[in-house]
Every structure is written in structure tokens, then in C-alpha cells.
Amino acid sequence: SIRTMHDRSNGLGGGFAGYGIYPEYADYYAFHVFYDTQAAKEECEREIERHFDIVNLSKIPTRRHPRITDAPMIWRYFVTPLPTKLAASQLEEREFTSRFVIRINHTLNGAYIFSSGKNMGVFKANGFPEDVGEYYMLENYEAYSWTCHGRYPTNTPGWWGGAHPFALLDTTVVHNGEISSYDANRRFIEMFGFSCDLLTDTEVITYIIDYLGRKLGMTYSEIANVIAAPFWSTIEKQEPKERERLTYLRNAFASLMVTGP
């Protein structure tokens, strides 16, 4: 169905996220990883083995495609945190895993964990989304929900890691347009342990949703009221309790409002 939107993208990034695709490994985090070099792969695998029990690893199956080129090495790992490492960290399991993913993506040159949730996975590449689906042989996966996207980058480069969906743990984001609030959003979110390294504004939106939802416990409705805050004129027309709630969200999280075309 994404083929009907071919002209909405320009071939500089396409991808899919499928939920429910790994029922046999539903209790394990599925790391999908791009590697630019063998050295990066070996170093990243050493880091994974130091912090996680790897129950299965393999190349992600792909087929040769004339319009998908310059592919990195693409591997998949089903993992669970090592009990000793998790206990020593004094972190909740999801926080332990998200910090590991962010650290690898920030510090390990040539390795990028682009999917890290449970019973779900992201498949993306530098190409049109319908070609990406063929490249990853997505007809072999069954999911209860899919998201997909085709990029038309203007201010940011087209590359494998910059394609959508963007993901952290189970959250995936697709986004159209450029956001003028990127730098304000980035400066705020990086105060809480996130690091924006992947050359596109959608990355910061993913981290905002993770921060507000997973860390602060907001509902998706509340998150929407932060990142797409109502106009003040709209807030003023609400009943007193709702007006107070929306005013608090807009004032307390002003730096997380996402604005732009």
C-alpha cells in the first residue's frame, strides 16, 4: 500500500516497523544493528555480551535489490540484561537497555542500534519504502500493526540510519516536515541522558516521547498536549480544571513543544 505514496518520497530513506513479529522471542529485546565495518561489529558485540545474555543472533535476511545499494552489515540479536549487570546498575530493565542503546549510538563509530524493542522490529534503508520492503523480504513477517514511511529530506542528509521509523525500545516514530524547534528540543532532552547523533530531527521527537511517556508516565493524550500544545486562545476557552491542566503542561514543558512546517 505504501507504493501508492511513491511520489511523496524521493528515495533517500524508507522503512517499516512491525509489532508482534517475534512471538517466539517475545520476552527478549530485539536489537537490529547496522555495522559499517567488521571492527565496529566485533567491538559492539563485545559490548553487548558484557551487558546482555544473547539468546540468538543472526544476519537479518535480505535479498539483492537493484535500487538498494551501499548496504551496511545488518545483524539481529535477541537479548536480555545480565542479572548481575542489571543489579549493579540499580536501574529498571528498560532504563538499563535504553541507556545502553544510546551509549552505543553515541560512542561507537560505525555501529548503530536502530531497533531495540520487544516483539517488534524496525527495517529501514536508503531507498523508497516499497523497495525497502522487498529488500528485507517483509512478506515473511506477520505483525498485528505496521508503521511505514518514505523520506523526502531537505535540510538533513539521506542515509541508512536517518530513515524512518526512528525507534527507542518499543516506541517508533515517523514524521513529515522539518521542525524549527529542533535545537531547543535537543538541548532540553540531552539534559536527561539522551544524545542526538543521527542527523535528523525525528530522532529528538522519539526521545521526547520516550521521556514523557516512559520516564514521566504521561498518557499519549498528555504527550500530545505537550508536543502539539493547544493555542493559548484555545486553552482559555476550556473548563477551569482542563484549563489548569493544559496551562501546566504548556508552561512546564515549553521546551518540548515541537514546532515547524
What are these regions (language model features)?
Residues 1-261:
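Conserved short alpha-helical segments that host acidic/polar catalytic motifs at enzyme active sites
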